[in-house]
């Protein structure tokens, strides 16, 4: 059954539901599970239509992403996208959800999307601390490559294999302004095991909440860029203030409740 949308609704929930159901041609396509005999005096198409529409409107308001997923061939939850600790790279399963979401937004031009990143103070902070130490190690090798005249364009392109890591770890340890490095009677640095050097560098690597929020923002921006790549206009996508852990706020309509998965991006439809 097809119904042409007429702009007579005035209540916001109805308008949001219509935006969710109306396709790019201005048509709302509703499937009616009709069975029975027209000769049956108890048979009522009107009642059936009313019930289906009421159910759709309710679902459009209370579970909009579930409705989109069912309409566009995605069985996954579309309202959250999880990330690996410390990473802003979109995983393969999240990319599939974004592709489904891109199809849905392309066919529902009245919809807009809020995108809010989250970072986990526990797991993300630990990974970022280790990444900070790894960067310091690569920096030391980069200095050597610069001196030799064959440095890459960026330290991100420098690789340190397991055989040479202790060498550059030692250089990073000696270059760092660590407060309590073991020294001998002459005040010179003592040789310490690599594990101890790394532990001191990790302890000195300070990852504050601002760094975590920057990571959350990078996640949100990565999701926005991926959705834009599907063909959705950037003007329909809005970045929301980042949040840490499961703290409330951010994307309106997101519960902030995803135990064990606070490293994510929350999505909400407007």
Q: Which positions does each model-derived feature cover?
A:
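Extended terminal
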Residues: 1-261, 267-270
